[in-house]
């Protein structure tokens, strides 16, 4: 029987527990273990490591527990400082060390606000109301996650314009082992930020290598969207938002899958890379012996070397890029224009379709293939 995965609690729940611990400290009551009700009604019990009085208020430290979710903040300390204010109505949120600040429009929070999402804010408001018996208690809540300054480099925050650290997140307060759907949804705000910045043509790349290559072609960082393996999902989200067009820029291994109609490109979902290359190369005149060599290749780069030795690489790559466009636009039922640029790991352009060239001319990109 499969073992049930353990749930944990979010950084937002850690902060809310810290606020409640601060109130209990002020009241002279035990604060070492905090009971909370998550926004979805789930009861939470969160241990508190320390509570101290500082010049800025009462500071509580809670160590994040992520359960069986592969979360980068597992084990980090979340410090929440509570300062009650008679001169204010409601709660003012502040970003402490390692918590980011919103610097670009398009997010759910205004520019200049600490990146403390609405779920944690609401959970903290409920805690303050519970502990004071009032909805309008004046308070200043500062959340610091010192490890967040470095951890943010491993997130999409720099792309989203969240500077200075990570975000305090959590929809309900409960951290359940991340589903694929949750990961996909975490990618979508990139599109909103790019659209808010005025980018009408977006550039989809699977990861950091694609991003580096895109920048080398003169493509604006604001237009670059990391999609991971979820090309189809992200195309749909872009089309829903009225995006004028998308350029798909990626390595041969990704683009040949899209040319075959595969829009979730993880190798456990589907892997017809060599078969697709072999089919298009054969259609362009590759010999039967070389087709077998393509099918026996270890990688798409090895397969392309076989095709190149026959003098067909340029033609085959151009056909594949064109086929990516056709497949993607068909996938979207013609709701958005799509172009394709295929590159190798060295960043050399192997294939470009006509729509990609049109995008490049309009946007000033350098596509030299």
Predicted regions mapped to residue ranges:
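Bulky hydrophobic/aromatic packing residues
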Residues: 155, 183, 187-192, 356-357, ...
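Surface-exposed flexible segments
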Residues: 79, 217-220, 353-359
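A structural signal for small-residue-enriched, beta-sheet-centric alpha/beta enzyme cores
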Residues: 6-9, 160-166, 171-350
